[in-house]
């Protein structure tokens, strides 16, 4: 299951993302965050990645937001 989910994100990175200008506000891009979250947390990592995408908007804080070792839908405060 992890491999399929990661393959979908890689498809997005290779074929869809290049069509749009870079817009991620975090140092680890949202798609790379999703891949790392899936690798660490399995399907829960998808939820973490979606929460991260919702946090990535023009009015949010920028900077580092690494994938936490524990499941959480909040921003990782250790990355600041």
Curated annotation (Swiss-Prot):
The keyword Cell membrane applies. Residues 62-80 have a biased composition (Basic and acidic residues). GO terms for cellular component: plasma membrane. Its main location: membrane. The keyword Flavoprotein does not apply. Residues 61-80 are annotated as: Disordered. Keywords: Cell membrane, Membrane. It is a peripheral membrane protein. It is found in: Cell membrane. InterPro entries: Membr_insert_effic_factor_YidD (IPR002696). Pfam families: YidD. Belongs to the UPF0161 family. HAMAP family: UPF0161_YidD. Could be involved in insertion of integral membrane proteins into the membrane. This is Putative membrane protein insertion efficiency factor. It comes from Streptococcus pneumoniae serotype 2 (strain D39 / NCTC 7466).
